[in-house]
Amino acid sequence: MLSKSTRLLRRCFQTDVDVIVIGGGHAGCESAAAAARCGSNTVLVTQNKNTIGEMSCNPSFGGIGKGHLIREVDALDGLCARICDKSAITYQALNRAQGPAVLGLRAQIDRKLYKTQMQNEINSTKRLEILEGEVAELLVENGKIVGIRMMNETVIRTKCVVITTGTFLRAQIYQGMKTWPAGRIGEKSSDRLSESFLKHGFELGRLRTGTPPRLMKDSINFSKFERVAPDRTPIPFSFLTKNVWISYEDQLPTYLGHTNDEVCRIGNENMHENYQVASETTSPRYCPSLESKLLRFPKLHHRLFLEHEGLDSPHIYPQGMSLTFKPEVQTQLLRAIPGLENVEIFQPGYGVQYDFVNPKQLKRTLETRKVEGMFLAGQINGTTGYEEAAAQGVVAGINASARAQNEPGMEVSRTEGYIGVLIDDLTSLGTNEPYRMLTSRAEFRLYLRPDNADIRLTELGRRHNAISDNRWAIFTETKGELNNLTQRTEEMKMSMVKWKRIIPKLAATSRNDGKVLSAFDLIHRYDLDKSDLELCLKDKNIGEDILERLKIEGRYQMEHERMKAKKQEIDRESATAIPDNTDFSTMRGMSLECIEKLERARPRNLAAATRISGITPEAIVVLMRHLKNPAPVRSSAV
């Protein structure tokens, strides 16, 4: 009897495969689902179908900047937000006091439940097949991808390929001074694909990351840690989720603790037996290992959070304690922390080094510049984190489908979304360290908020066939209600004296008695609630969520007006391309330092050039003058 994989291979020869996605991680799942959703016959190739949707490191989604990405993936009808809302066990939003613009949606996730829900979603997606196996070679003819060759020599022809191999390219795991080839504990690395990239002239780099040990829950004395309660009013990730599936009482707390002098002593005494310390490969700046923390701040105490890995899981994840020491040293370190004196380790922490492709070799659609029809997404592009991977995955999947169907690709500008900021930073400036999304990277973060991600991106996704009819119906209804309420509240105007007669809570307000204000002004200035608005409009059918969105829009309205001119300027700069063969050394009036930085960064457009550290306004003026009246460019002849 034929195996499912063999039967699928035979079907692949008889029917067209529009898109092949290599890798079943967060980028791969989003990419495969998006391509299929857009109407392309899609095959997801993975070494093991049982690891699809695996949360390789932390049991959480979201955070500052990252929560914005999840909302934007959801606005493009991606999967991860909805799956998180079906598997979250603790909601703890960050930055609530700093305002809606930088609110960090975050939740602890049940690993097992998330993976099960994701696999169910992938398996039920129309036009999407799963194939188990390892890809040995990318088949390219005349600069265009035409298929893949599997390790068993089977060839599958296709129009487009999306590569989402995560940390598996020529990957090596290490603990202490011991190293061995693997992309994840117990899973082999993908070496042949790296060779295929090099064969086709791609520039590869090397990065590293790590993961903490997993601890046995029943060996921990939680009473010595500070209990951190979940949010009483959790905020869902998806616009389609009205209420989260788990009650406040059933959510699990996290626990806060700190390292101490003894941890510092043990760590510093064992640094000489740590491969990571000896290695020159760059590690994540914003998710450092304990070794990196001790090297930079040898005398400081560092925070750690104990996080549950699932509702019924016996394991605890120590957030902030990524370790690559040998296992016995990890045990010694952990047992020096109060509450962990008797801790047992289920799985020691480890580090992993892997190849990545310089993302400056990509277009803004995430298609490679060297090979037509080849798209890259996720950690292969130098990023770190589930959310960054998912964001790239949904864009790559939409654009691979568009390419396969000879339709225009979708680009998100940095003025439209954090996805645009992410992709623009990668493709324009590249990266020499694992890239993490931060709100500080976005120039228009007061506009690029989690609450309005659907308003910003869902119509764009619909134009590229990425939005289901169900989501579109919900979105158009929401947008219509918001526009209607905005218009009604803007048109209803009267003096503050009259408003005080209608809304009792305004009676104590002494200012602006003679000033004419609209109901829209009052909502965000005086934080009116649903009952207040009902008094204004004599309407009891106003939804709490629509009112909250209206308040936020009002809060940032003046800033939006001020930003319009700047947004237009950045859009113009982004559209001003800098040719690949531009010779910056011929530009008169530019300092040698700026020339060297421009030569090294090779920005793709004027907007990217302005973001290079050390590039002066004078240098930008010279560059703009050159782009209008270009001097002779550097010869590309060999």
Curated annotation (Swiss-Prot):
The lineage of its organism: Eukaryota, Metazoa, Ecdysozoa, Nematoda, Chromadorea. Belongs to the MnmG family. The keyword Protein biosynthesis does not apply. GO terms for cellular component: cytosol; mitochondrion. FAD binds at G23, G24, G25, H26, A27, G28. SUPFAM superfamilies: FAD/NAD(P)-binding domain. Gene3D superfamilies: FAD/NAD(P)-binding domain, GidA associated domain, C-terminal subdomain. InterPro entries: FAD/NAD-bd_sf (IPR036188), GIDA_C_N (IPR049312), MnmG (IPR004416), MnmG-rel (IPR002218), MnmG-rel_CS (IPR020595), MnmG_C (IPR026904), MnmG_C_subdom (IPR047001), MnmG_C_subdom_sf (IPR044920). Involved in the 5-carboxymethylaminomethyl modification (mnm(5)s(2)U34) of the wobble uridine base in mitochondrial tRNAs. This is Protein MTO1 homolog, mitochondrial. Its cofactor is FAD. One of its GO terms (molecular function) is flavin adenine dinucleotide binding. GO terms for biological process: mitochondrial tRNA wobble uridine modification; tRNA methylation. It comes from Caenorhabditis elegans. Keywords: FAD, Flavoprotein. Pfam families: GIDA, GIDA_C_1st, SAM_GIDA_C. It comes from the Eukaryota.
